[in-house]
UniProtKB/Swiss-Prot annotation:
GO molecular function, one term: 4-alpha-hydroxytetrahydrobiopterin dehydratase activity
Alphabetic keyword roster: Lyase
Protein name as catalogued: Putative pterin-4-alpha-carbinolamine dehydratase
Source taxonomy: Bacteria, Pseudomonadati, Pseudomonadota, Gammaproteobacteria, Oceanospirillales
EC number in record: 4.2.1.96
Organism: Hahella chejuensis (strain KCTC 2396)
InterPro entries named among the record's database cross-references: PCD_sf, Pterin-4-alpha-carb_dehyd, Pterin_deHydtase
Similarity remark: Belongs to the pterin-4-alpha-carbinolamine dehydratase family.
Gene3D superfamilies from the UniProt entry: Transcriptional coactivator/pterin dehydratase (3.30.1360.20)
Reactions accelerated catalytically: (4aS,6R)-4a-hydroxy-L-erythro-5,6,7,8-tetrahydrobiopterin = (6R)-L-erythro-6,7-dihydrobiopterin + H2O
Length: 112
């Protein structure tokens, strides 16, 4: 998996889902993230903790800005002191390499 972020190649109908044989490797690169499945669709998600709502909202807005840069958007749930980020590729109904790259970007924003 590359650290460079392509435009939303995961949004193409012919984009390939992550090879199941590589899934553990990708997950190991974002160890705080967990694999989920909803209605047969694999996703990765993580809860981030903050001291207050303002900091949670600031993080949400930063993640939203990077999502807008490449037109690939996560599910974001913002609460007092917590943000849950969930990535998957809607078009292919599953995980693409881009989802893991975006999870790494979220980590960079959080740790900045």
């Amino acid at each position: 998996m590359s650290d460079t972020i392509p435009s939303c190649e995961a949004c193409r109908p012919d984009a390939e889902k992550v090879d199941p044989a590589k899934l553990e490797k990708y997950l190991s690169q974002v160890p705080e993230w967990r694999l989920e499945e909803r209605n047969g669709v694999q996703m990765i998600s993580r809860d981030y903790k903050f001291k207050n709502f303002a900091l949670a909202l600031e993080f949400t807005n930063k993640v939203g800005a990077i999502a807008e840069e490449i037109n690939h958007h996560p599910e974001l749930v913002t609460e007092w002191g917590k943000v849950r980020v969930t990535w998957w590729s809607h078009t292919i109904k599953g995980l693409h390499e881009l989802d893991f790259a975006m999870a790494k970007r979220c980590e960079a924003v959080f740790n900045a």
